[in-house]
Amino acid sequence: MIKAIIGLGNPGEKYKNTRHNVGFMVADLVAKSLNCDRKYREKAFSHIFECPDYDVIIAKPQTYMNLSGNAVLNILKDYKIKPSEILVVYDDLDLPLGAVRLRLKGSSGGHNGIKSIINTIKTEEFPRLKIGIGRPEKKEEVSDYVLSPFTKEEKFLLDKVLAHANECILNVLKYGIEKSMNMCNKNLV
């Protein structure tokens, strides 16, 4: 049973609409869908939204992406949650924009936020929802690409992706991860 949905991103207005912050975008949408408390609490280096109608919290670590493990470890300790009871939502360069993948566990795949979590909590055994953002087409640096906003054309598809990710998470909360995989694992283009 999932007890915490953790959306990864970077704190601050500067990063709000960037590709690297799709985890935050999904977390906000899920918090709204679950009618969670509108005011977040500062706890465990994160903004925490409590959802009294559901036995779940929504967390947005405020440690910057590469230090996400510190926040996740504190969430696990403060809320007495096991790694298998979290769902980490984050951007994935290796999936095209429009692709969503739900996984029970796995490696970091080169994602620094996931790498930080794995190194800090000492396990790869935690569920995750990967949101495809694609790779830069030109010779753009990956770091510049993930920290740039979506284009106008991409935003149209992004809205569909965020809505699908939200539905996926609602299914996970209702039916569990394994039963939700077929519904969740889609390419929307």
Curated annotation (Swiss-Prot):
One of its GO terms (biological process) is protein quality control for misfolded or incompletely synthesized proteins. It is found in: Cytoplasm. One of its GO terms (cellular component) is cytoplasm. Transmembrane segments: none annotated. The active site is at residue 20. GO terms for molecular function: peptidyl-tRNA hydrolase activity; tRNA binding. It catalyses: an N-acyl-L-alpha-aminoacyl-tRNA + H2O = an N-acyl-L-amino acid + a tRNA + H(+). InterPro entries: Pept_tRNA_hydro, Pept_tRNA_hydro_CS, Pept_tRNA_hydro_sf. The record marks 10 as: Discriminates between blocked and unblocked aminoacyl-tRNA. Monomer. PANTHER family: PEPTIDYL-TRNA HYDROLASE. This is Peptidyl-tRNA hydrolase. It comes from Sulfurihydrogenibium sp. (strain YO3AOP1).
